[in-house]
Amino acid sequence: MDIILKIKEAGLVGRGGASFPTATKWETVKNAPGDKKYVVCNASEGEPGVKKDLFIFKNHAERMVDGMKIALDYLGAETGYIYINPSYYNKLARKLNKLIKDTKIILFKKDHRAGYIGGDESALVNHIEGRRIEPRLRPPYIATNGLWNYPTLVNNVETFYNVSLVSAGEYENKRFITIGGDCPNEGVFYFDENWPIEKILRETNNYPKFKFFVRSAAMPVAKF
């Protein structure tokens, strides 16, 4: 079965935060005019406390690279870039460079001064081009006018990991979740996409004994 059909059948959405349908993004880049196309893995991970990309790199880097290769092949892309958090680069460059040897993929170290905003897909495209690291006005969008104004696919580390699973028929609609801060069991966990926060906290033995409410997935719980 064609990879796009597999991705559609799996209902795969991006894991970078927007949950945009992966197949739609890939098809947009595929159908955009341009004699060159590019693929970027966004491994910026600038959100405080979030460590799922690092976990995937340490434990499933081969899968992530495989997902990028699948994207490169589908698009007939010129080059792929792993745009990586500088602290991760220092830990993982040797491992990743070994995995991407003799491929079209290049490891690109994010400037530590780029901060959180450096993870915006248009800002990272500017960075790779050697321009000022700031978001672009949109439209046009990166899918049609990205690196050097060519169609560019930007997906998160976890998205490429999932593409590899989908291709192998092993995708189970799960997601990596970071739990950290003032809790007994910090870590990165892998649970069903549809699990509620209460079930996740109980399953990881992190459910508070006090009354609380969750303000957002990236903020601490509030006591009352």
Task: Annotate each predicted stretch with a short phrase.
Residues 25, 78-80, 205-218:
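Short loop-to-beta-strand transition segments
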Residues 65-71, 192-208:
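Short amphipathic, charge-patterned alpha-helical segments
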Residues 221-224:
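Eukaryotic mixed-charge, acidic/polar low-complexity intrinsically disordered regions
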Residues 36-38, 174-176, 211-212:
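A residue-level signal for beta-strand positions that form part of recognition/binding surfaces
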Residues 1-133:
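Iron-sulfur-cluster electron-transfer modules
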Residues 89-193, 204-208:
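Hydrophobic alpha-helical positions that pack around
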